[in-house]
UniProtKB/Swiss-Prot annotation:
It catalyses: L-methionine + ATP + H2O = S-adenosyl-L-methionine + phosphate + diphosphate. ATP binds at H15, D174, G175, K176, D254, R260, K261, A277, K281. Its EC number is 2.5.1.6. It comes from Corynebacterium kroppenstedtii (strain DSM 44385 / JCM 11950 / CIP 105744 / CCUG 35717). The lineage of its organism: Bacteria, Bacillati, Actinomycetota, Actinomycetes, Mycobacteriales. This is S-adenosylmethionine synthase. Its cofactor is Mg(2+); K(+). Mg(2+) binds at D17.
Length: 400
């Protein structure tokens, strides 16, 4: 039997890029909390001893950004310069301007409304940018996610938990996980081939001790909790800090930037990506809201039994409410004609930006919790785009 190896990775909240995502989304949440109609595009850069926040916003309230930055860093665990970064003493610079009036006008008054015709309320708000967004779902896991990224995220979350709960001492915030799975010709996972964990740690920690601790307190519990013990055999390769010592990490080890972990944030490379990042963007930006909607669509299609795997693409033009394109792909696993599935999607889901924002209730401060460990398949969170609330509607639309 032919085995094909597929790999996905995740990173912890102390990874430099994820620090930036967390800061950007914390600022977004704070602005939505004081003004749900805020338009926000915030980028963060971190480097040794410094945090730089830049972007464009429109918000009718006030947010104390430097304090928010420092609190986010403390929550992650950067508490001392001894570990390379101190949230209390690092430099914080803020350079945020007002959103472009031209962009704001296109979002507030869509092309359909500007044409002078009578339009519905949901036709009045245009997409915040052009672009294409993808959503994906598969029935290979209970959370409808590809197993490699699901396991990588579980390992990363557990790695952070054992650090914060002091189950494994001497760990520091920065870390990465990676999982390689073997798939058969029917695209079913048959065994876990390789697990890689790299974690920042205090000086003087031996690699042998670290491997024993992480095997016992991270890998074994995750495998059991995920219910994939049957995929583990004697040929499993486990690599713990394969580069050796990892004392210098976080922003001291590498500069970080918002939006550089878009594959970690989505499906681990198992599905296509439109290129737009999520963090620091309010839901008028379809990079974020439409990608969430596409996950909602794909997950409900698979849960309805219409396909075993599903990828959905949508595309928008800036300032226009209605999508310019919709494409459904089921990789030969469809149980109904793809044309019928796509027609059902168009009947059941309203993909105009204003409708997406309303149906998923996206003008809320819910985004900082998604900044690390993935935006999809989160069994630890109640996220509106993960709800299976259109399954019956899709089935009914197909049967008509």
């Amino acid at each position: 039997m032919t085995q094909r190896l597929f790999t996905s990775e995740s990173v912890t909240e102390g990874h430099p890029d994820k620090i930036c995502d967390a800061i950007s989304d914390s600022i977004l949440d704070a602005m939505l909390a004081v003004d749900p109609d805020s338009h926000v595009a915030v980028e963060t850069v971190v480097t040794t001893g410094q945090v730089h926040v830049v972007g464009e916003v429109r918000c009718r309230g006030y947010v104390e950004i430097p304090s928010l930055v420092r609190q986010t860093l403390r929550n992650i665990g950067f508490l001392s310069s001894d570990m390379g970064f101190d949230g209390a003493t690092c430099g914080v610079s803020v350079s945020i301007g007002e959103q472009s009036l031209e962009i704001g006008a296109g979002v507030d008054t869509a092309l359909e409304a500007r044409d002078g015709a009578e339009v519905e309320d949901d036709d009045r708000a245009g997409a915040g940018d052009q672009g294409l967004m993808f959503g994906y779902a598969t029935n290979e896991t209970p959370e409808y996610m590809p197993l490699p990224i699901a396991l990588a995220h579980r390992l990363a979350r557990r790695l952070t938990a054992v650090r914060k709960d002091d189950i494994v001492p001497h760990l520091r915030p920065d870390g990465k996980t990676q999982v390689t799975l073997a798939y058969n010709d029917d695209n079913n996972p048959i065994r876990i081939d390789t697990i890689v964990i790299s974690t920042q740690h205090d000086p003087g920690v031996s690699r042998q001790w670290l491997e024993e601790q992480l095997r016992t307190n991270v890998i074994t519990p995750v495998i059991k909790d995920a219910g994939v013990e049957n995929l583990v055999d004697d040929e499993l390769t486990v690599l713990i800090n394969p580069s050796g010592s990892f004392v210098v990490g976080g922003p001291m080890g590498d500069a970080g930037l918002t939006g550089r972990k878009i594959i970690v944030d989505t499906y681990g490379g198992m599905a296509r990506h439109g290129g737009g990042a999520f963090s620091g963007k309010d839901p008028s930006k379809v990079d974020r809201s439409a990608a969430y909607a596409m996950r909602w669509v794909a997950k409900n299609i698979v849960a309805a039994g219409l396909a075993d795997r599903c990828e959905v693409q949508v595309a928008y033009a800036i300032g226009r409410a209605n999508p310019v394109g919709l494409y459904v792909e089921t990789f030969g696993t469809e149980k109904e004609p793809i044309s019928a599935i796509q027609e059902a999607v168009q009947k059941v889901f309203d993909l105009r930006p204003a409708a997406i924002i309303r149906e998923l209730d996206l003008k809320r401060p819910i985004y900082a919790q998604t900044a690390a460990y993935g935006h999809f398949g989160r069994t630890d969170l109640d996220l509106p785009w993960e709800r299976l609330d259109r399954v019956d509607d899709l089935k009914a639309a197909i049967s008509r």
